[in-house]
């Protein structure tokens, strides 16, 4: 999202733009997402949900997102729904493939399968490589020693290229570099890409969460359950058990009832054990996007001549969770505008 939005905005402002895409297609992890671009309905709720984030950055995203979403629709991005399904948030669900195509039409065709290397002297550079969740080494360094056991719930190319380049150019790390957004997934041999959303085990608030040694998760459980999945990621094998009482099986989640989610886990081979008046499901931490990254100002600046947006930029969702697509959209546009001065 961030790179394509920056390119489209820069072209709109009359700039010549080159886009270097490491992967074999455009769209990054946006194409694998549900396509919902949202913000918290109320500013105070945003601060409650992400209390450790940079307040100035958060204010920019919160105040500019609605106009940025209108800009996307003006480019022809197809809207699927104008509701998020969450009373705490407002936003729009786009068709991810159609959104990608609209941004490409407005911007430029990326040079696929190409890594940038070193920046070009005197040419503004916007880093939008999607974070570092695809690098086992960087995840091990900053997030968890259990990096090899995590399931990558994202594209395989976002492996810290932007982070490393920005640091080498004089940038610094944001707060929250140890945090990430992800989901608990069925602990099975493989979770297919088309199961990243539908197989999510999002019912920790109805369960007792314990690791293999019987140690319980005792922390808070927010609506997105990111605190839980981060805890799971630091347990042996990045695994845990959700133990659900029978009384909670009919509870509704955003992906279906708890019983339906458990059945999906069973069907893909996860261990599901029936116990006395409860069901236990083995889950593994899936990492979608790192929360921390390069420290930026409200225009996305990292260092002289270098900007960052999306997963490469940290500081917006620190301490919780907010729409990564929203941050990428707003800050990608802002970075392009500032880079063109």
Regions found by a protein language model. Give the residues of each.
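A glycine-rich dinucleotide-binding beta-alpha-beta segment and adjacent secondary-structure elements
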Residues: 269-319
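Conserved N-terminal/central alpha/beta ligand/cofactor-binding core
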Residues: 22-109, 207-222, 247
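Glycine-rich loop(s) and the adjacent beta-strand/alpha-helix scaffold that form part
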Residues: 123-185, 325, 331-334
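An anion/pyrophosphate-binding glycine-rich loop and adjacent beta-alpha core
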Residues: 163-165, 169-274
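N-terminal Rossmann-like FAD-binding beta1-loop-alpha1 element of flavoenzymes
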Residues: 1-19, 336, 340
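Short, well-ordered coil/turn residues at beta-beta hairpins
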Residues: 122, 127-129, 212, 308-312
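Catalytic phosphate/nucleotide-handling subdomain of diverse soluble enzymes
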Residues: 304-341
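Helical element adjacent to the flavin cofactor pocket in flavoenzyme catalytic cores
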Residues: 91-118, 122-123, 163-169
């Amino acid at each position: 999202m961030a790179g394509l939005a920056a390119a489209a905005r820069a072209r709109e402002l009359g700039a010549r733009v080159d886009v270097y895409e490491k992967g074999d297609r455009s769209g990054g992890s946006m194409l694998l997402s549900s396509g919902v671009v949202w913000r918290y309905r109320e500013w105070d709720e945003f601060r409650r949900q992400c209390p450790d984030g940079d307040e100035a950055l958060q204010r920019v995203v919160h105040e500019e997102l609605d106009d940025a979403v209108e800009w996307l629709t003006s480019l022809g991005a197809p809207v699927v729904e104008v509701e998020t399904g969450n009373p705490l948030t407002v936003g729009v669900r786009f068709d991810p493939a159609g959104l990608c195509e609209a941004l490409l039409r407005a911007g430029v065709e990326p040079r696929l399968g190409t890594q940038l290397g070193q920046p070009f002297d005197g040419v503004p550079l916007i880093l939008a490589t999607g974070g570092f969740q695809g690098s086992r080494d960087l995840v091990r360094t900053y997030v968890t020693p259990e990096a090899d056991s995590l399931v990558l719930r994202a594209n395989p190319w976002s492996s810290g290229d932007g982070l490393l380049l920005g640091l080498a150019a004089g940038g610094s790390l944001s707060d929250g570099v140890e945090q990430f957004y992800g989901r608990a997934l069925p602990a099975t041999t493989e979770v297919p890409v088309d199961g990243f959303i539908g197989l999510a085990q999002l019912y920790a608030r109805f369960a007792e969460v314990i690791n293999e040694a019987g140690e319980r998760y005792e922390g808070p459980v927010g609506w997105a359950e990111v605190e839980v999945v981060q805890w799971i990621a630091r347990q042996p094998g990045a695994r845990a058990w959700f133990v659900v009482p029978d009384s909670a099986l009919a509870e509704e989640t955003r992906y279906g009832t708890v019983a339906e989610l458990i059945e999906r886990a069973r069907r893909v081979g996860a261990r599901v054990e029936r116990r006395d008046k409860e069901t236990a499901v083995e889950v593994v931490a899936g990492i979608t996007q790192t929360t921390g990254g390069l420290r930026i100002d409200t225009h996305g600046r990292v260092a002289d001549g270098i900007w960052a947006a999306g997963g490469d930029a940290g500081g917006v969702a620190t301490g919780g969770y907010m729409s990564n697509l929203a941050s990428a959209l707003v800050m990608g546009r802002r970075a392009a505008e500032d880079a063109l001065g």
